[in-house]
């Protein structure tokens, strides 16, 4: 079994939990609250900006020009392509995506997730650690979306179904590249090192779950007390 497949197998319980959590279940039914979607979009805009920067940090770690070219293309996709999925949710909220994200928001769950990825990028020379931290994002979105396609609860009469349709196909290219890179880099690593990479991957899976849940709880920073002067 290739290393990437071992990671996916280990992540299955977490992905199952994400699928059964309120965010995805309400998205399937099409009855998710507008406030939750607004919260998600504002947080995701901040997250994706940093995720794009992480692609740029990966480029110097690449040995192949083809890999560099693909990462540059992914930066373009993050800036332009994924806006289609965001527009779907913004229309449900009843506001333009630009209006929604004009309110800057950096929730605890997004903060911790991004710092986890930046730590790998800055503290590890081997690119596999950064890739392992980033890879769960597209992989989990794709897995959730593909599972939804055969779920009788997916309400085709609601616009949220279009969000699942988008992610059921649009993540495939980056998933395949991340898989190939991780599998290639894993070949020269010890079992102990691969366990560390696995830990990084699974931690990002947990961060993904917390990110979705953040939207449902309208997560804010809590510094103690009702008023902080």
Swiss-Prot record:
EC number(s) per entry: 3.5.99.2
Q: Which residues are responsible for catalysis?
A: 137, 208
Among the GO molecular function terms of this UniProt record, one is: thiaminase activity
Q: Which reaction does it catalyse?
A: 4-amino-5-aminomethyl-2-methylpyrimidine + H2O = 4-amino-5-hydroxymethyl-2-methylpyrimidine + NH4(+); thiamine + H2O = 5-(2-hydroxyethyl)-4-methylthiazole + 4-amino-5-hydroxymethyl-2-methylpyrimidine + H(+)
Where does it sit, as one GO cellular component term? cytosol
Site annotated as Increases nucleophilicity of active site Cys: where?
47
Please name the Gene3D superfamilies in this protein's record. Answer: Heme oxygenase-like
Sorted keywords for this record are:
Hydrolase, Thiamine biosynthesis
Pathway(s) where this gene product acts: Cofactor biosynthesis; thiamine diphosphate biosynthesis
The residues listed in the UniProt record as binding substrate, with positions renumbered to this chain, are 44, 141, 167
Q: Does the keyword S-adenosyl-L-methionine apply?
A: no
Under the heading InterPro entries, the entry gives: Haem_Oase-like_multi-hlx, Thiaminase-2/PQQC, Thiaminase_II, Thiamine_Salvage_TenA
Any GO BP annotation: thiamine biosynthetic process
| Class of this enzyme | hydrolase
Q: Which domain of life is it from?
A: Bacteria
* NCBIfam families for the chain: salvage_TenA (TIGR04306)
Q: How does it assemble?
A: Homotetramer.
- Which protein family is it in? Belongs to the TenA family.
Q: What does this protein do?
A: Catalyzes an amino-pyrimidine hydrolysis reaction at the C5' of the pyrimidine moiety of thiamine compounds, a reaction that is part of a thiamine salvage pathway. Thus, catalyzes the conversion of 4-amino-5-aminomethyl-2-methylpyrimidine to 4-amino-5-hydroxymethyl-2-methylpyrimidine (HMP). Is also able to catalyze the hydrolytic cleavage of thiamine; however, this thiaminase activity may not be physiologically relevant. Therefore, is probably involved in the regeneration of the thiamine pyrimidine from thiamine degraded products present in the environment, rather than in thiamine degradation.
State the name under which the record lists this protein: Aminopyrimidine aminohydrolase
| Gene coding for it | tenA
């Amino acid at each position: 079994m290739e290393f990437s497949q071992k990671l996916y197998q280990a992540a299955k319980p977490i992905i199952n939990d994400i699928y059964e959590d309120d965010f995805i279940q309400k998205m399937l039914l099409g009855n998710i609250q507008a406030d939750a979607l607004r919260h998600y979009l504002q947080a995701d805009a901040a997250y994706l900006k940093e995720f794009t920067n992480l692609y740029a940090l990966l480029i110097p770690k690449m040995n192949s020009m083809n890999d560099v070219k693909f990462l540059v293309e992914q930066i373009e996709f993050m800036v332009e392509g994924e806006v289609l999925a965001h527009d779907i949710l913004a229309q449900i909220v009843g506001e333009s995506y630009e209006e929604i994200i004009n309110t800057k928001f950096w929730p605890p769950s997004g903060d911790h997730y991004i710092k986890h990825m930046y730590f790998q990028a800055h503290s590890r020379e081997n690119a596999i650690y950064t890739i392992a931290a980033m890879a769960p994002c597209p992989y989990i979105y794709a897995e959730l979306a593909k599972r939804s396609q055969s779920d009788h609860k997916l309400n085709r009469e609601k616009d949220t179904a279009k969000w699942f349709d988008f992610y059921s196909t649009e993540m495939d290219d980056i998933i395949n590249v991340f898989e190939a890179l991780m599998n290639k880099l894993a070949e020269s690593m010890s079992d102990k090192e691969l366990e560390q990479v696995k830990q990084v991957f699974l931690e990002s899976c947990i961060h993904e779950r917390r990110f979705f849940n953040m939207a449902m709880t309208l997560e804010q920073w809590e510094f103690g007390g009702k008023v902080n002067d």
